[in-house]
Structures are given as structure tokens and as C-alpha cells.
Amino acid sequence: MKKTILQEASIKYREEALANLKKFVAINTVMDLKSASESSPFGTGVRQGLDFVADLGRKLGFNVDYCSHYVTELSLGTGPVIDVYCHADVVPVSKNWKTDPFKVTIDSNNKMYGRGVSDDKGPGMASLYGIKMLSDLGYINGYKVRMIFGGNEENGSAGLEAYFHKLKKGYPSYGISPDGDYPLIYAEKGIFTYKASYDLFIPGLTNFHFGQATNIVLDEVKLKLNGVTDLEAKVAKFDMENADIRVFLAEGEIVFKGKAAHGSIPWEGVNAGLYALKFMSEVLNIPVLENIFNDYNDGRGTAFDGNYPSKYFDGASYNIGKISYEDGKLTLVCNMRLPENVGPEEACTNIANKTKAKIELIGGSPALINDPKSAFIQELLKAYVEQTGDTESKPLAIGGGTYARDSKNSVAFGCTFPGRDPKMHQDDEVFSLEDFYASIYIVAAAVDKLGKLAIRESK
């Protein structure tokens, strides 16, 4: 395939884009409400990340709006608006990384490792330089591009909600979020959070708290149980009988080591917290804990008839991201992803009836469905095909959620190529240099096609 104009033009931006990605990843932008304030609503780390983007955007010639530090807006041009939604925040890291998660490490295969390289600092940086390239080439003519780096995508999209509703920013003609897969994602499941509570007594325990985020499979938990006879033998037996999980004693605590995965696909991980409940059910003879394990371990809601396959999706998902026990109450916090054919209230009523837990729906957002035959989607597909030559890959419907659901006329577009595993929300998150560089010109092509479409439609 002969190189396109944008492919050729993008080469000179590669070195600078990579250098600034390294600086961006070096900032720990995990949300920290302990350090939050009016000027840093998501904590000082996220604020530093948003300020870094603002300073870089200004140097590159963008107009900058700090947006009360909920998001950073970088804009160029005038006319119908095309939005590009990225996020500066990242999910927490474990101690099991093979490299420093806050340093970009590039291996011999030109793969980059670091928290945020694929979700979403790498795609964000590629998009930023793609838009800069469009400006330098004179392509941004008759339309406006707003690049929006959010500060709270991983914990509920409060940043973008403030952008549109508190700050009263207008919706775009079209928008893309490079926080998913190529060629594009036209449908996303509804994403909701609920608490499931159980009144029960666990002997030998006063309290415990597992997990930091609901959209990550719990990959490691530690538990201190008092008064259990032959504990070492019981731990060894449980470890031998449960091949998916590693269980051992260390410094007086029982360690459960599972496997992290994105909360939208919990079946690809191993939930250490659920296995801790199963262990307690066996050694302490508490059947309800075994029931909880069976209810949630497959991640699909099969045990309580909660799968709901639909026209667009293969079914629901349920990820238990937090588990706590205090004052005789066990509480699970579940990240629930639902197809368009069922509402959260109906799903929660079903769970309450089938599991006998007290269910409290906390909130969320409904499914997003775009018409794959619309001019909007077709223009994006043209951009992808023209820049990659890939005519085989089809638009996707997924369980993951992006900023696209918080806007209008928006979809996730890139930057994970078909067949790649970016290990989002897992240890050793990865993004290849080749894909990073390619996304500079692919996102640029998409933005320009949408800009021209918006101009045509405005006349």
C-alpha cells in the first residue's frame, strides 16, 4: 500500500510525540480524593496531568481552557465542532508489574509498557499530534476541533459531566473517543454500579477491605484469620484444589493471587476477593459465602439468570471490584454492564430476588447505540480503511465504556488494533510504537473527514 499524505507527514511528529508521552506517563494520575480540593477536584496527581496537557497544548499553538480543572480543553479553528475525547487519569497499579508503571519502558520488540500507554495517555498524545499535524497542513479550515482531556473517566466521567452541564459547553457536531478499538465501536453496554449487602457473622474477623476500583478484577487480596486450627494445611489444600488461584501464607496473612482484567470482561481474570470468600466458606462453614462465589465467579450472572443477550450484545457482565466486611455486614460493590434490552432497576430487582442480598443501585449510564449505516459511521470507516488498507475488520459492540456515551453523535475510534491485547487495567499495560505512530495519522484522517462532513451538513 502506497503511503498516504498523512502517513508521510506524520513521520516528523513521532519523536516529539513519544518524548511527551514519556513525560505524561511519568505523572501518577490515579484519582486521589484525599488530596482533592476546589482547584484539584480529582486530586493533585490528576491536576498535574491536566496542567501538563494544557502547557503542551499551548506550546503547540492550541487555545487552552482549564475548565475549572475538571478537564483540559485544547481547541483550533472555527465552525462546526468536532470533539476528540481522551482522559488523563489512569487506574491504580499493583505491585506485580515487571517494569516501573510510571515510566515508559520500550522492549526489543518496540512495545511500550507503562500505566496509561494504551488507556488513555498514548492514544491521547497520538491524537494531539495528529490534530497538530492537520493544523500545520492547513486542513482545519471551516471547522473547529476541541480536544478534551478528562480527569475522571476511570471513576465515573464526572469531568465530562461538568464540562457539558456545569460549564455549559455545547455538544459537538460529531465526536470520537480514541479510548477503544479500531475500526470503531458503534455500541457500548450500559454501565452501572450497585452494592450488595449481607448481614452475617464471620468468626475470627473484625473487618477487611478489598479493592480500589470497581472496573478492575481484584487480582490480589490479603486476609488475616484468627482462631483457625491447622490453617497452614487448610491453605495448602485450598491452593491445590483451586488451580486458577495461588493461595499461600506470608507474614501471618493468607495471600490470594488471581489475575487482573478489565471490569467489562471479568471472565478473563481471576477474582482473588471471591476466592477469599470461598476459602472462608469452607474453613468457617459459612454457606452464604460459597453462594456469593457461585453467583459472581463466572462474571456473566448465569447463576441468577442475569445475562440478557440482545441484538447487539452477547449478554451482561458483573465484576465485583470491592469487598468489605465491617460490623457484621459484608458488602460487595459490583460494576454491572447491561445490554440495551434491560434496565438497571429490573436487573437489580432480579439480583435481589435470586441472591437474597440487599441491593442498592448507586448510578450509571445507559447503553449507547449508533446506526452503523449512518454517514457519521461510514466516514470514520473510510478514514480507517484509507489509512490502513484493512477492509476486513468490522465495527464493534462492546462491554467497555468510553466518553462517547457522555456526549452526542460520538463513538469510540481506536486506538487498539484488531488482534492486539493492550492489557488495559492490568499489570504491564502495553502499546506498540508502531500502533502509537499509526494512530497519529489515523485519528487525524478521522477528524478531518468528520470536519468536512459537518461543513457539508451545515450548508
Show the residue positions of the predicted features:
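Acidic/His- and Gly-rich active-site-bordering loop/insert found
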Residues: K2-R115, D136-N141
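An extended, acidic, His-containing surface patch that forms the Zn2+-binding/catalytic region
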Residues: D65, S264-D327, V333, R337-E346, ...
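Acidic/histidine-rich catalytic neighborhood of metal-dependent amide-processing enzymes
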Residues: D120-F201, G301-Y312, S458
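Active-site metal-coordination/substrate-binding segment of hydrolases
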Residues: V81-F149, E154-N155, K169-G170, Q426-D427, ...
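A generic structural motif
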Residues: T72-L74, L223, E251-K259, T331-C334, ...
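Short, conserved charged micro-motifs
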Residues: G204-L205, T229-V235, N341-C348
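Residue-level signal for inorganic ion chemistry
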Residues: F24, N28, L225, A276
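Acidic-glycine-rich active-site phosphate/pyrophosphate-binding loop
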Residues: S94-D107, I191-F192, A196-L200, R246-G258, ...
